[in-house]
């Protein structure tokens, strides 16, 4: 199989082409969601990693793995938004409070020996509060207009201009909030040694760390889909509407 040249791509473009590549990027702590627009080689060098070594691993993954990941790049924008709403928005609202409740229980039991849990608990609580505000803005402001633009394009119609002139403004706000959440979960990961359970951890302690890791992984996919696929397509739709 022909080796791919990743040096002309951003990290986000590589992940958009094959979501399984996140396994490689995550292993090297290369941010593919919040900073997915970073050129591949630059992202590697920022982590002190040889781009050629990472490119070799990516090519090996492509050659030796049968991907079960959805080809999100082939989905229309309305389906992508449906997926984000039904999988990620619902997932945050369903799983977030459950994780918070278990984290509170674990913190009460283990914070004497593991005071870092108090910080983790506070960070996660504020994350859920900020995410709820973030999701509401997407659901009530940005996504309805993107749906409207997509439907108008399908039917050969025009839509009224966005109320604040361009969707670039809310998108920039969303991306800034994504960055903030990414940084917050980096702190949680650092405090928990990459969600690794200490030797004295009980079953609940181990479970909540596993759940926090899964929550972060889902958040990474969520942010990747929006920053690297949905938002650029929405801006392109708006540009075509203006012609």
Regions found by a protein language model. Give the residues of each.
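Small-residue-biased structural context
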Residues: 1-243
